[in-house]
């Protein structure tokens, strides 16, 4: 096998889809042309963009002689720019330089029909009845085929071999043949370009779907695509192809050759067709690029929007997550604080805490009493200071715990207010001592000298003992009575002070000269009258003033003593006693109320029990009640006694029934008698 056949086989192995497997057993040989002479026609189109064209009729059985295509342009990059659009005007004009009769090597003539556009806009497919007649001598598979008029020859491949080799290929590969045609950059050839419409192109080939049946390319310098009509005996092959143009198909499939004479007109047509092709391709490519750029920009904008939304969602999620974390922490802290508050409240209200504070107050009172002794105060000054600091720390801790447990409710209790005031005074005392130890000059400041007065307020801590002795009922009642008597006592003390002021003014005006030591001014006079409330030294006042000739002081002093001592002081005592009595009565009444409540609760429980029993009895049937009644009344009788008692009861019931009938009959008789007498009186009157 020569070089051309080997190239052909390698091409079909690379493009196995270029042949239709339906022609696997075609009986007629067909030469495989390689080169074309310049003045010979023969056009083959295998372009899905442009459809099929009617091919020249060829005579099988001799040497095929074809025109060699003239090279019009040179394409450096034939794979990207190989658009072979054939001129529609040239095809309509039927430009061809093929001779009508060419001698065949086997003694037969090979008539070639004029190339025409199959399925064109004006003429349909024309079929020559003399087309493809077989001559006397058939093709021999081993005979070489040559082109006498061409510049080169090759060992051709018979039609049978061609079909045997190509029809075993895959139909899918056959369809891919048009998409994978490659061109060499050194290939130069002439083409006639023509824009084709999306029309149907017939292909006559024995009712087989034959796409690219003879579309093959010589793997030499010039790729040629042919599409021919063949008449094999009586078999006529006819096929209609429908194709739609696209940019990729224009670039790889629209390769057709139309044999034209090398003329200036053909060159112009070819150039115009190429320009039209490149313009259409550039427009399509520009539109595709614009659409792709729009899609890319839209996709980028959508991606940016998606990223922004995702970032916003992430930020919102982070904020919500942070807020949830803070809320969770706050809830946990609040829960812990609430639990701590409840624990502290239970601690401050416990009996052990009250007992501990009571012991501390008692010890503090003992220390205050011990500090009154000069010798003990001098020797145990350091110890007393340490103990005072410990007591102060305990008082502060108590106040803080109660403030945490009760909050502002701590100040609603007067005893708590007293405790807080004592604690503040103790803190001031401690601060004054510390300032005195640091700087004596600063301690002598007027402000701290005023605060030093409150140091004596430590004695009020002893009152805490009364507060801590609340476990004693009687003492608690006395303290409650005193607190309840304060308004009345305050009113009485106000009257006493008013009376004291009036008597001070009068006594100073009358006895200033006779007794200047006691009645010199209003303050000395007030002090003298206040000491007289105890009835002390009033006789000495009378003696000194009588010696000075002021004997009339006696009635004034007597009036003052009666008003102040016998009236107002007794009023205070009366108020206290009355309040104590009221407190006792309230206590007794409270006890009675508690007893009555207990009795009422017991009665309520009994009534509920009776109601429950009544409900249980109500649920019992009448027969059960009768049986219960009988068992209660006659449970201790024998059977004979019960029978006799039953008969007795029956007789008693019968007697009562007859008595009832007798009464009713007697009533009727009485009515009749009364009516008779009334009727007789009426008749007698008439």
Curated annotation (Swiss-Prot):
Residues 147-160, 245-271 have a biased composition (Polar residues). Changing residue 270 to I: In strain: 72. Coiled coil: none annotated. Its main location: membrane. Residues 374-382, 436-446, 511-521, 535-551 are extracellular. Testis-specific. Disruption phenotype: Mice are normal but males are sterile. Male sterility is due to defects in sperm motility unability to fertilize intact eggs. Sperm of the CatSper1 null mutant lack CatSper2 protein, while sperm of the CatSper2 null mutant, lack CatSper1 protein, suggesting that stable expression of CatSper1 protein requires CatSper2 and vice versa. Residues 1-57, 97-177, 207-271, 289-318 are annotated as: Disordered. Residues 1-351, 405-412, 470-487, 578-686 are cytoplasmic. Residues 25-35, 211-229, 235-244, 308-318 have a biased composition (Basic residues). It is found in: Cell projection, Cilium, Flagellum membrane. GO terms for biological process: calcium ion transport; cell differentiation; flagellated sperm motility; fusion of sperm to egg plasma membrane involved in single fertilization; regulation of calcium ion transport; regulation of cilium beat frequency involved in ciliary motility; spermatogenesis. It comes from the Eukaryota. Residues 1-15, 128-142 have a biased composition (Basic and acidic residues). InterPro entries: CatSper1, Ion_trans_dom, Volt_channel_dom_sf. Keywords: Calcium, Calcium channel, Calcium transport, Cell membrane, Cell projection, Cilium, Developmental protein, Differentiation, Flagellum, Ion channel, Ion transport, Membrane, Spermatogenesis, Transmembrane, Transmembrane helix, Transport, Voltage-gated channel. Activated by intracellular alkalinization. In contrast to the human ortholog, not activated by progesterone. Residues 522-534 dip into the membrane without crossing it. One of its GO terms (cellular component) is plasma membrane. Pore-forming subunit of the CatSper complex, a sperm-specific voltage-gated calcium channel that plays a central role in sperm cell hyperactivation. Controls calcium entry to mediate the hyperactivated motility, a step needed for sperm motility which is essential late in the preparation of sperm for fertilization. Belongs to the cation channel sperm-associated (TC 1.A.1.19) family. This is Cation channel sperm-associated protein 1. The lineage of its organism: Eukaryota, Metazoa, Chordata, Craniata, Vertebrata. The gene is Catsper1.
């Amino acid at each position: 096998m020569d070089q051309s056949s080997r190239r052909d086989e390698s091409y079909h192995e690379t493009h196995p889809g270029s042949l239709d497997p339906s022609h696997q057993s075609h009986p007629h040989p067909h030469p495989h042309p390689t080169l074309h002479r310049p003045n010979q026609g023969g056009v083959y189109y295998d372009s899905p963009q442009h459809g099929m064209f009617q091919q020249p009729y060829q005579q099988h059985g001799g040497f095929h002689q074809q025109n060699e295509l003239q090279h019009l342009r040179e394409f450096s990059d034939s794979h990207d720019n190989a658009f072979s659009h054939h001129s529609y005007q040239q095809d309509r004009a039927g430009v061809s330089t093929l001779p009508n009769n060419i001698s065949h090597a086997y003694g037969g003539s090979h008539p070639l029909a004029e190339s025409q556009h199959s399925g064109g806009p004006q003429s349909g497919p024309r079929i020559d009845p003399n087309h493809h007649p077989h001559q006397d001598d058939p093709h021999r598979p081993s005979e070489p085929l040559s082109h006498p008029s061409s510049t080169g020859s090759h060992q051709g491949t018979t039609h049978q071999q061609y079909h045997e080799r190509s029809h075993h290929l895959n139909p899918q590969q056959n369809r891919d043949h048009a998409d994978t045609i490659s061109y060499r950059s050194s290939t130069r050839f002439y083409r006639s370009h023509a824009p084709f419409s999306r029309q149907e192109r017939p292909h006559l080939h024995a009712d087989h779907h034959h796409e690219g049946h003879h579309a093959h390319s010589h793997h030499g310098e010039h790729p040629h695509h042919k599409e021919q009509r063949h008449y094999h005996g009586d078999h006529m092959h006819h096929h209609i192809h429908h194709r739609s143009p696209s940019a990729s198909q224009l670039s790889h499939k629209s390769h057709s050759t139309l044999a034209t004479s090398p003329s200036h007109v053909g060159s112009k047509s070819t150039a115009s067709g190429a320009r039209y092709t490149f313009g259409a391709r550039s427009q399509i490519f520009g539109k595709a690029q614009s659409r792709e750029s729009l899609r890319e920009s839209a996709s980028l904008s959508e991606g940016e929007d998606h990223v922004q939304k995702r970032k916003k969602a992430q930020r919102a999620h982070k904020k919500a997550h942070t807020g949830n974390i803070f809320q969770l922490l706050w809830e946990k802290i609040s829960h812990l604080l609430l639990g701590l508050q409840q624990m502290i409240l239970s601690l401050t209200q416990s009996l052990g805490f009250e007992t501990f504070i009571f012991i501390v107050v008692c010890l503090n009172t003992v220390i205050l009493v011990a500090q009154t002794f000069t010798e003990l105060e001098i020797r145990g000054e350091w110890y007393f200071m340490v103990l005072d600091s410990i007591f102060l720390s305990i008082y502060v801790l108590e106040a803080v715990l109660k403030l945490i447990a009760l909050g502002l409710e701590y100040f609603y209790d007067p005893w708590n207010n007293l405790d807080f005031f004592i604690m503040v005074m103790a803190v001031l005392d401690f601060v004054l001592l510390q300032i005195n130890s640091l700087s004596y000059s600063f301690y002598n400041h007027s402000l701290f000298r005023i605060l030093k007065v409150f140091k004596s307020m430590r004695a009020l801590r002893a009152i805490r003992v009364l507060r801590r002795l609340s476990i004693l009922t009687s003492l608690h009642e006395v303290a409650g009575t005193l607190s309840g008597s304060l308004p009345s006592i305050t009113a009485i003390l106000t009257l006493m002070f008013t009376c004291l002021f009036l008597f001070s003014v009068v006594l100073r005006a009358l006895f200033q000269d006779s007794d200047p030591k006691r009645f010199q001014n209003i303050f000395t006079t007030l002090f003298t009258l206040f000491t007289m409330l105890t009835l002390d030294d009033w006789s000495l006042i009378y003696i000194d003033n009588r010696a000075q000739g002021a004997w009339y002081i006696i009635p004034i002093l007597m009036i003052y003593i009666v008003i102040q001592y016998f009236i107002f002081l007794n009023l205070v005592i009366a108020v206290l006693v009355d309040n104590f009595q009221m407190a006792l009565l309230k206590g007794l009444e409270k006890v009675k109320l508690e007893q009555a409540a207990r009795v009422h609760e017991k009665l309520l429980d009994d009534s509920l029990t009776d109601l429950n029993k009544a409900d249980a009895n109500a649920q019992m049937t009448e027969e059960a009640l009768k049986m219960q009644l009988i068992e209660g009344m006659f449970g201790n009788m024998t059977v004979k006694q019960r029978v006799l008692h039953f008969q007795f009861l029956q007789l008693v019931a019968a007697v009562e029934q007859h008595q009832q009938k007798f009464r009713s009959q007697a009533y009727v008789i009485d009515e009749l008698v009364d009516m008779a007498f009334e009727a007789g009186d009426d008749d007698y009157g008439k």
